[in-house]
Regions:
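Long amphipathic alpha-helical segments with strong coiled-coil/leucine-zipper propensity
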Residues: 105-213
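Basic amphipathic recognition helices
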Residues: 202-226, 230, 242
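Extended, helix-rich scaffolding/adaptor regions
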Residues: 1-154
Length: 291
């Protein structure tokens, strides 16, 4: 799992604490890292024993009140090693959401994904209303003399710019995977970008549903996928477990979003950020409560 040069804003301060499965038998013996990641912190006890913890919590993404990550990491380890029982998969995903502080905080901290979701609605909703040529002009994406997949690459860059943070990176990866639905339509290089004008009229809803499914899955793998790598019997077993998780999340999310007003998701909709965050919360709630 890539952590980047700094601690991922997706994860709480205690994420790297020992979880009972650590490769280091004494994780408490590791020196505490300063923000620059190079020097151990001096052991100067604070008058307020919770002061340091409070400071770290405030530096987390959107400052949600995270709970311990140990149950999430332990249950994912059990599931990956085949010791989780019949409910191993559901428990692993449920504890993962709980470790984000519950469905509300899991949704609230997914800011990059929320922005990208709205951007998908803006772009493909615009294609339905105005046509792809006009929408590309609106987004300053050149067409002349370019292959469709080159144009699609620009569309991805507009909807989810090159990431600066791990949060952005997961959101972008989810978009790239979601856009495979569109890329596949241009496997025949003779096809023109105007093909987008003839897509299913519900393409915006289809892509938004796929994006939310994919983001939730990719975020889980980013956060606790290392448990699968370490505890699965081999690479084939790990791939099977990841596939099971992906299908489980996709089923729950698609069912949750089935009758939701996805077609109105765009920047012109009043309180659209609240609307989209609410959709993420509902999806996370279903996963948290194992509904």
């Amino acid at each position: 799992m890539y952590g980047g040069p700094n601690r991922s804003p997706l994860l709480p301060p205690d994420f790297n604490d020992g979880d009972g499965n650590s490769d280091n038998p004494n994780p408490q013996d590791k020196p505490e890292q300063q923000p620059d990641g190079n020097k151990p912190a001096e052991n100067n006890p604070s008058e307020n024993p919770n002061e340091n913890e409070s400071t770290l919590q405030e530096s987390s993404s959107n400052n949600p009140q995270y709970t311990s990550w140990r149950p999430a990491k332990n249950s994912m380890s059990k599931y990956a090693s085949g010791k989780g029982g019949s409910n191993g998969k559901r428990n692993a995903v449920s504890n993962y959401v709980k470790s984000h502080g519950g469905s509300q905080n899991a949704a609230k901290s997914a800011k990059s994904a929320i922005r990208t979701t709205i951007s998908i609605g803006d772009f493909f909703g615009g294609v339905k209303q105005k046509g792809i040529t006009q929408v590309l002009k609106d987004f300053n994406i050149p067409i002349e003399g370019r292959k469709p997949k080159e144009i699609l690459n620009d569309i991805v860059n507009v909807l989810a710019p090159t990431p600066d943070l791990n949060d952005d990176s997961v959101a972008r990866k989810a978009l790239v995977n979601t856009m495979s639905i569109i890329y596949e339509k241009f496997d025949d290089e003779k096809k023109d970008i105007s093909l987008l004008d003839s897509l299913d009229s519900d393409i915006s809803k289809i892509l938004i549903t796929k994006y939310i499914e994919t983001f939730i899955y990719e975020r889980l793998i980013h956060d606790v996928g290392s448990r699968i790598e370490k505890k699965a019997e081999n690479s084939n077993a790990a791939a099977k477990i990841e596939k099971e998780l992906k299908e489980y999340i996709e089923t729950k999310v698609s069912t949750t979003l089935k009758d939701k007003p996805l077609s109105i998701i765009n920047s012109e909709t009043k309180n659209v950020n609240v609307l989209v965050e609410g959709l993420y919360q509902q999806c996370y709630k279903v996963l948290e409560d194992q509904l």
